[in-house]
Amino acid sequence: MSESSEKTSTTHFGFRQVAAKDKKTLVAEVFTSVSRRYDLMNDLMSLGIHRAWKRYFVATAQVKSGDRVLDLAGGTGDIAMLLKNRVGAEGSIVLGDINASMLSVGRDRLIDRGVVARLEYVQCNAEALPFQDKCFDLVTMSFGLRNVTDKDTALREMFRVLKVGGQARVLEFSTVTAEWFKPIYDFHSFQVLPRLGWLFARDAASYRYLAESIRKHPPQEELQAMMGAAGFERCGYRNLTGGIVAIHSGYKY
């Protein structure tokens, strides 16, 4: 998206239409607000299941000892912590996040747990990654893509920084597949979740946005096609918990 088109175009922020140039600021405000309670937010949104989803996401990644991994939207460091055990002493991880508050929480948490070796923290925008071409074996993004303004550009950037033979994996809230469950899920998302956000964090608006952002995120087949358009091959996805989340993957050849 060019600078001139960004000034005139609009995009969604939850269910609101906003100027594309303003979305990054609005999203930043949300995550600055919830950064210290980010795990609580995910617990409320997923009823605690997000921890199992993340473990499965990393366990099924084709990551091996010695790999160099970029974890985008690295947040509070959950994925980096799991990946560190997989890449071993010779591997390295770059934890990237556009939000300084989230990055600070992740850094503090990993340092407190003694995870310091061969781990780098970079504040970066997924739409303009500050890395050379073909420098990572694996790129991951967990619960972050739906907050990106220009998802197509972010996917192309993920493709660019991957080595040939590398894999990109995206874990994201997606489209529920069971019709009978959709009303229950909607009730939890739009009625229960904002109230819990207010009760535990005195912040209903941020939690309402996060629920809305899930509904605006591309469904599984559309995101798979977007990854293909970005250059990835062997694109596919796996639904977890009835499509509440999906793991998308693609390879660079």
Curated annotation (Swiss-Prot):
A Gene Ontology biological process noted in the UniProt record is:
aerobic respiration
CDD domains in the cross-refs: AdoMet_MTases
Cysteine pairings via disulfide bonds: none
Q: Which UniProt keywords apply?
A: Menaquinone biosynthesis, Methyltransferase, S-adenosyl-L-methionine, Transferase, Ubiquinone biosynthesis
E.C. designation(s): 2.1.1.163, 2.1.1.201
Q: Which SUPFAM superfamilies match?
A: S-adenosyl-L-methionine-dependent methyltransferases
The UniProt function text for this chain reads: Methyltransferase required for the conversion of demethylmenaquinol (DMKH2) to menaquinol (MKH2) and the conversion of 2-polyprenyl-6-methoxy-1,4-benzoquinol (DDMQH2) to 2-polyprenyl-3-methyl-6-methoxy-1,4-benzoquinol (DMQH2).
HAMAP family for the chain:
MenG_UbiE_methyltr (MF_01813)
Q: What is this protein called?
A: Ubiquinone/menaquinone biosynthesis C-methyltransferase UbiE
Q: Which organism is it from?
A: Xylella fastidiosa (strain M12)
Taxonomic classification, please? Answer: Bacteria, Pseudomonadati, Pseudomonadota, Gammaproteobacteria, Lysobacterales
* Gene name of the record: ubiE
